[in-house]
From Swiss-Prot:
One of its GO terms (molecular function) is mRNA binding. InterPro entries: Ribosomal_uL13, Ribosomal_uL13_bac-type, Ribosomal_uL13_CS, Ribosomal_uL13_sf. One of its GO terms (cellular component) is cytosolic large ribosomal subunit. Belongs to the universal ribosomal protein uL13 family. This is Large ribosomal subunit protein uL13. One of its GO terms (biological process) is translation. Keywords: Ribonucleoprotein, Ribosomal protein. This protein is one of the early assembly proteins of the 50S ribosomal subunit, although it is not seen to bind rRNA by itself. It is important during the early stages of 50S assembly. It holds the Pfam family Ribosomal_L13. Part of the 50S ribosomal subunit.
Length: 142
């Protein structure tokens, strides 16, 4: 029996809706990254993007354990010498709550062109409203 290898044109992708309210950031992100990669499917193939689309709502209600709200830092560089900017989890949630989930999930995906294609299938919204009702996403309890 030959080993099955999925072909990009034959991959069936579903849309899922995840409610992040009250969920722990890392546990949510690891399951979302797993589904974006397609590792939950029997036809998973490492070199083909077999993952599903994930829509996350209520990103502003995600939580972290312990003192991470004050201690977890996010860094970025502006491009100017000495302009390393930093903010903690609470400041990031005030400024852009969806970015915290995006950073967590992106860090769990492969760092190559395939990983960037997988990340494009993630849609994160701070509130309960999203613009993907036409795709009829199925509710997914994580």
């Amino acid at each position: 029996m030959k080993t099955f290898s999925a072909k990009p044109a034959e991959v069936k992708r579903d849309w899922y809706l995840v409610d992040a309210s009250g969920k722990t950031l890392g546990r949510l992100a690891s399951e979302v990254a797993r589904r974006l990669r397609g590792k939950h499917k029997p036809e998973y193939t490492p070199h083909v993007d077999t993952g599903d689309y994930i829509v996350i709502i209520n990103a502003d209600k995600v939580r972290v354990s312990g003192k991470k709200a004050q201690d977890k830092m996010y860094y970025h560089h502006t491009g100017y010498i000495g302009h390393m900017k930093s903010m903690n989890f609470n400041q990031l949630m005030e400024r852009a709550p969806e970015r915290a989930i995006e950073f967590a999930v992106k860090g769990m995906l492969p760092k190559n062109p395939l990983g960037r294609a997988m990340f494009k299938k993630l849609k994160v919204y701070a509130g309960t409203e999203h613009k993907h009702t036409a795709q009829q996403p199925q509710a997914l309890e994580l």
